Amino acid sequence: MLNQVVIVGRLVAKPIVEENENGRKVSEITLAVNRSYKNADGIYETDFIKCILWSCIAENTAEYCDKGDLISVKGRLQCLGGSELQVVAEKITFLSNNKNKEE
C-alpha cells in the first residue's frame, strides 16, 4: 500500500511551534492551494489543506517561513475522524518567500 502526497501552496499564517504533553515539538499549518482549473464562473478556487509538522521540520519551518511563503509538503494523509484529513509532513521544501514582494 502507498500513502504519499505532495502539495505546493502558500502558508495562510506564520507557523508557530508548540510542545505537546510528551515534550515533542509540533506545528500545525494550513496551505492555500489553487486548483488547476477554473470553475463555472471562470475563477480558480482555492483549497485550504491542514498539515502537521513534527520536531526539526516544525522548528525549521517556523524559523524560516512566514505567511504567504510558497512551500512544498511531502507526506502522508491521516484521517482525523469523519471526513477530516490532514497531511503529516515528512519533508518541507521552501520554494519562495513573500519578502521580495514587499520591496
What are these model-predicted stretches?
Residues 1-103:
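Single-stranded nucleic acid-binding surfaces, predominantly the OB-fold ssDNA-binding core
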